Amino acid sequence: MIQIQHLTITHTKDLRELVHDLNLTIATGEKVAIIGEEGNGKSSLLALLVNPKAHFDHLSYEGTINKPDSPQVYIPQQISDDLQSLTLNDYFFADTYDLDYATLYRLADELHFDSERFASSQLVSSLSGGEKLKIQLIRELARPHDIIFLDEPSNDMDLTTMTWLKDFIKHSDQTIIYISHDEDLLSQTADTIIHLELLKRRRQARTSVEHLDYDNYSQQRTDAFQQQIQQAKTEKKAYDKAMAKHRRIKQNVQTTLRNTHDSTQGRLVAKKMKAVLSQEKRYDRLAQDMTQMPDKEDSIELFFSHITPLPQGKYLLNLDKKQINIAPHLTIDHLKLSLKGQEKIGIVGDNGCGKSTLLHYLYQRLSQKTDLTIGYMPQRYDAILPVELSPIAFLSKTGDKSEREVISSHLANLNFSHDEMNHAISDLSGGQKGKLLLLHLVLENPQLLILDEPTRNFSPTSQPQVRQLFENYPGAILTVSHDVNYLRQVCQKIYRLDSQGLEEVEI
């Protein structure tokens, strides 16, 4: 059992609360999902629950976290740099203390990771995002554990592994606390919801806890929101009607008082005015106690404009090659792919089959065209983001005041606070970095977008806007994704990649 009492987490760099007065008891075996918009402090809360005694840059907290001194597993969003430099052999076998080999090999089989690779000299850093997640799950879950902490475990998973993850969480006897933006995963696995919100332009934290599954929580929240709106409107209508009557009475009394010359009558009218003013104070108090319109986090606002797409029939890409090496250890028997000026193509496939490698290969090939402008969004944002700069500095070309004001307005529409616009990009969450890259694409107005898992770090609130953004984009798109909703809404054709090549599929 884990007990959290009056936990408040503050971002010390801009003195802003991320978590406000969280109180929760987590029972053994409970499945707790932490949800919220990008940059709302989900990973900070999870890391603090993993190790309440740790020191965190730019974070302080008040309150208590009591949890049993029992073995636990923590799988972060990204594997650490020191582990990235290891070979697979060292990753799995450099420290074999308390490693259950039977579980290790069983998990490898369940996750379709070839156990012969355990002894490989291949570097962890060379693995795909999905493979890195798999080896973490295999190694960590093969050790004793009573509590499991997962930070966005579904981000890089193929559809087969996602099915495994849902089944694992649902049927596990251990306590599992996890962060996710995947509504399907949430609806099938969570029985308790911690919802982190930042309201009033991200200045006010609201932390909600409900012992409900995700679907019921979402429905209850929607119903309560609508009920509060209706109650606020009803009370406001009654208040406005009462105040209109009160103003008429007050005006009549004021007119009578001004026109009264008899002292006796004047005293009576003055007494009546006193009663009217007393009633006015009661109305003022009533206004303060009225049901307020509910606060809600703003959805993002972003759209492409001023783009002149290439002609529909113009070929941007027309490949038909056999035995093509797109990387030192990746050969495709027959790569056949064409892309026209306004076509939107999606690529799917198992973890480690080479989707991101292929996409980068195509990006490099297409970048050689001098008559084509390309916007590129890799899976790992830091590969192209200058993390030492602020978002405003990154997006600025001239640095003049008017340009910075326009950029600030765009960032505000993506729910960046003033402080977040001016902090280093390295301080941003994964989702905020994703938003920043989206804005960069919009401001560049490219004719072709090459996107690697573009929805992976976005919340359920932001994802519909992201899908709509790319659906309405008038140019061509070449994208890799495991997000079925995104693929169905945006792409006209979808291909599955394996060692044989690309095959058009329906999903």
Label the model's feature ranges:
Residues 31-37, 43-101, 197-202, 341-406, ...:
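ABC ATPase nucleotide-binding domain signature region
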Residues 140-146, 441-447:
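A short, proline-enriched helix->beta-strand linker immediately N-terminal to the Walker B motif
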Residues 152-153, 158-160, 424, 450-454, ...:
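Walker B catalytic motif
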Residues 4-7, 14-30, 63, 319-343:
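Conserved beta-strand
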